[in-house]
UniProtKB/Swiss-Prot annotation:
The lineage of its organism: Eukaryota, Metazoa, Spiralia, Lophotrochozoa, Annelida. Keywords: Disulfide bond, Glycoprotein, Protease inhibitor, Secreted, Serine protease inhibitor, Sulfation. Residues 35-55 have a biased composition (Basic and acidic residues). It comes from Hirudinaria manillensis (Asian medical leech). This is Hirudin-P6. Belongs to the protease inhibitor I14 (hirudin) family. GO terms for molecular function: serine-type endopeptidase inhibitor activity. The keyword Secreted applies.
Length: 63
């Protein structure tokens, strides 16, 4: 399963597969047609991955 890597601080930045970063209040979403930046929640991680809903963004994307 593929999923977004979102901040938990409300910045609404996601890294799609590869180095695509969604900004401007958009999130990444994966579906049968591939990846895209969309308004809203984006694609969530599987719930059995632990207490965090989203993966953190790597430090190099936050500067």
């Amino acid at each position: 399963m593929r999923y977004t890597a979102c901040t938990e601080s409300g910045q609404n930045q996601c890294i799609c597969e590869g180095n695509d970063v969604c900004g401007q209040g958009r999130n990444c979403q994966f579906d049968s047609s591939g990846k895209k930046c969309v308004e809203g929640e984006g694609t969530r991680k599987p719930q059995n991955e632990g207490q965090h809903d989203f993966d953190p963004i790597p430090e190099e994307y936050l500067s």
